Amino acid sequence: MDFEEDYDAEFDDNQEGQLETPFPSVAGADDGDNDNDDSVAENMKKKQKREAVVDDGSENAFGIPEFTRKDKTLEEILEMMDSTPPIIPDAVIDYYLTKNGFNVADVRVKRLLALATQKFVSDIAKDAYEYSRIRSSVAVSNANNSQARARQLLQGQQQPGVQQISQQQHQQNEKTTASKVVLTVNDLSSAVAEYGLNIGRPDFYR
């Protein structure tokens, strides 16, 4: 009986010791799960940061220059005004803004207004050039018209001296127009008329 009691007591002590000792395999598995969770969280943070950077435009994954993006914020445009000023000088901008009662301390805002003015003038010049080309093509078609040439010959027979002078002037005009493009006030008035501006002569002067 004493042997059985000693064996039972030893068995109970061993069982309690096994219950108190931690399981190393389970603890290792928990550490692995924590490491996996940390790595997944880090990957998600890196992905979100990369997407935020690309959406912000501060960094480009494909190496495309910054100025190729068409959609820019006002802050980005103002930052570009520091390094890339417009064609209109700052002194001219200050003069006309002061003349019209517009006082701004920030130079970038002034340059932004100058850039808008530059774009407006460029569009008007392009439109005036197109009107000049249309006018030149109409003049060439009238010169190639047989009826117009017959009318000029008839006038030359009636007034030979005037016809000779007009032919010389016409040849000189052809030489000059072939070498350069002439923009007239009529071309400019037709171009700015699309923007609601009337710079033509009033009707009572005609």
Curated annotation (Swiss-Prot):
Give the record's GO biological process terms: chromatin organization; positive regulation of transcription by RNA polymerase II; regulation of transcription by RNA polymerase II; RNA polymerase II preinitiation complex assembly; transcription by RNA polymerase II; transcription initiation at RNA polymerase II promoter
Q: Which GO cellular component terms, listed alphabetically, does the Swiss-Prot or TrEMBL entry include?
A: nucleus; SAGA complex; SLIK (SAGA-like) complex; transcription factor TFIID complex
The protein's UniProt keywords, in alphabetical order, are: Nucleus, Phosphoprotein, Transcription, Transcription regulation
Q: Where do the segments described as Disordered lie?
A: 1-57
Q: Which Pfam families match?
A: TAF10
Annotated domain remarks: The histone-fold domain (HFD) mediates heterodimerization with TFIID-specific components TAF47 and TAF65 as well as SAGA-specific component SPT7.
Q: What is this protein called?
A: SAGA complex/transcription factor TFIID complex subunit TAF10
Organism name = Saccharomyces cerevisiae (strain ATCC 204508 / S288c) (Baker's yeast)
* Gene encoding the protein: TAF10
